[in-house]
Amino acid sequence: MKSVNTDIAYDHVRQRILRGDYGPGHALMTEALAEEIGVSRTPVRDALRKLEADGLVEIQPRLGARVKQFDRQEFREMCELRLALEAQAAGLAAKNRTVEDLEEIEAPLIVMRTITAELENSRVRAAKLNKIAKEDVRFHLAIMASSKNALMQREILRLHLIHRVAQTPVGKSFQESAPREEQIANNDRVLTEHEAIFAAIAAGDGRAAKRAMESHIENLLEISLRKLALQERERVAESLVADELIYSA
């Protein structure tokens, strides 16, 4: 029963982290989670340790557990590892893919084409941007499956989950504050890069597939780091204003 309850607690907390219910830095209180999930505290503690091993949670003595909060250096390192693994996986996919694999890779791409075209002629809505983000992940995971390397696939999936958590504040901020033209341009760029990756894999050109994936993740890293730097500056500015208000009072 302990193992079952640990799995239940693990799945519950993991899903809430991935949905963004528990954002980066959110305190994960063992007693409150146990009551929320309907299990004892022991399986919750075990679940949090598993999530720490996954890279989604950090546990500090006397401070307890929190959803992992990534700084720019950690985010860069994670993207660099993604680049190395996913570029290699794309090359393997070009070599090992089947007709069925190509259909699985193209399916999310078709959805992204449709939504991107819709966004050109309508107001940008968060629901559509979220759908694109989900199809983006589906596209990448289909490529990983086509590589036929199970170990690489598991590690890339883990990195995608970490990336999703690390990107939560960046993505929300982008949706809320970026001009419509910038959002559309970003979607167009991502779609173009995905088209290039798919075309290379479909053609069986491993070298081109690796280059296309490398370029895609390098662009993602550059844009994301720029947004993270902007957010850090905004947080510092807000902190200075708060300190000034306290001092003035």
Which stretches of residues belong to each language-model region?
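C-terminal all-alpha effector/ligand-binding and dimerization domain
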Residues: 169-249
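Short amphipathic alpha-helical segments, especially helix-boundary/capping motifs
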Residues: 6-8, 21-24, 38-41, 62-67, ...
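Low-complexity, flexible helical/coil segments
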Residues: 94-96, 104, 115-118, 126-128, ...
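Short linear motifs at protein or domain termini
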Residues: 1-95, 151, 226-237, 241-249
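A short, mixed-charge helix-start or loop-turn motif at secondary-structure junctions
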Residues: 30, 71, 121-125, 176-183
